[in-house]
Amino acid sequence: PNFDGITLHVAELGSEILEHCKKLKVISRHGVGYDNLDTKYLKKNNITLLITATANAVSVAEHVMYMMLSLSKGITEYDNAVRSGNFKKNVNKIETYELLNKEILIAGFGRIGKNLIKRCLGFEMKVNVYDPFVDKKTIELMGGNKVENINTALKTADFLSIHMPLTSETKNLIDLKKLKTMKKNAVIINTARGGIINETDLDTALNNKIIFGAGLDVFEKEPINMDNPLIKNKRVLLSPHSSTFTQECTARMGIETVQNLIDFFENKIKKNMIIKL
């Protein structure tokens, strides 16, 4: 093939395909993740990788808020109660919480984390941020408190929202050992990448009421296997990696994907759109 650039959504692009693209200079990804690409091949062959760095932050941050509110307010249980005719019966036994004065730990303070903190502060939450790559002043100027040790911060967190890439360092970062240190009313939200939370350990923690609940938009294997125990766990709120599927975000991502390609060939691509391989 004689093309110079590719726009890529969810298709897998391995070296067995890329090696036929002799003129390829750039791949513009429709999204921010690139698990579906052979990045070693791209680096070896000096192929630039671009992402839609700014398009999805609001949509994902709102999705986190939706999951936090749904879990803490018992939305699923209340909805089921009304639909099953139990308008009053036992609904006062459903355990619910306010967000006011609750402590959230935002793990990863990139574009999404920075959009999330504004929404959490609007609910008058206390915000701790764990990100070794972001300085204390930046976090404090946005109203957060920088924490240096994630293990210590987990012990007091009412909510944990994960916004890290999946790497060898973050794989199974949240395991049973860490979950056992958290509060019994704690809720974990993951809209980043599956595999950062050990799913077997999370299921165990929820079944044994070690923590209160979890909201997952991403999974170690996608689509999630139907025999995954989390499917039947009523203490988990699930969505199919859909936190960016708002009408507005979809439009922004499409435009940004194409614009990045144009900007690259016109030598005016913004640095934050380029992934360092």
Task: Enumerate the language-model features and the residues they cover.
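Phosphate-binding beta-alpha-beta segment of Rossmann-like dinucleotide-binding domains, i.e.
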Residues: 47, 53-103, 115-118
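Short beta->alpha connector loops at strand-helix junctions that form conserved
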Residues: 9, 30-31, 46-58, 150, ...
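Rossmann-like adenosine-cofactor binding region
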Residues: 12-18, 134-229
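An N-terminal-biased, well-structured beta-alpha scaffold segment characteristic
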Residues: 1-50, 155, 175-177
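Glycine-rich Rossmann-fold phosphate-binding loop(s) that bind the pyrophosphate
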Residues: 109-110
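N-terminal glycine-/charge-rich "phosphate-binding" loop or analogous flexible N-terminal tail
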Residues: 1-5, 124, 137, 265, ...
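Phosphate-coordination loops involved in phosphoryl transfer and adenosine-cofactor binding
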Residues: 24, 100-103, 176, 185
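Rossmann-like dinucleotide-binding domain for NAD(H)/NADP(H)
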Residues: 49, 185-277
